[in-house]
């Protein structure tokens, strides 16, 4: 499954979060692949598109939960969303 993980860093945790990121590179845990990661310029917000198991997602979030406010939502591509929408509309 693919997930979009978003984060915000509180001002109190900003320095520690940046230091950890620079030291580790924030690799995805085993069972998870990073598809893309974006940082909003000039702010403490970012986006991490990953693919993997629920367990790997839980591990990823646990690794950063002490410094970041994290949210993860499952996401699908247009072709999957379109097929589901077509199926639902056909029932109505």
Give names to the regions the model predicted:
Residues 45-47, 69:
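A common structural microfeature
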Residues 54-62:
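Short amphipathic alpha-helices within nucleic acid-binding modules
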Residues 1-45, 52-55, 76-92:
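Short S/T/G/P-rich N-terminal loop/turn motif that feeds into the first structured element of a domain
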Residues 25-26, 64-72:
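A common structural junction motif
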């Amino acid at each position: 499954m693919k997930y979009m993980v978003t984060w915000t860093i509180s001002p109190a945790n900003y320095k520690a979060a940046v230091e950890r990121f620079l030291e580790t590179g924030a690799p995805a845990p085993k069972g998870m692949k990073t598809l893309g990661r974006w940082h909003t310029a000039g702010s403490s917000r970012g986006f991490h598109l990953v693919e993997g198991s629920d367990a790997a997602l839980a591990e990823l979030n646990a690794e950063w939960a002490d410094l970041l406010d994290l949210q993860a939502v499952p996401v699908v591509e247009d072709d999957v969303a379109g097929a589901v929408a077509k199926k639902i509309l056909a029932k109505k």
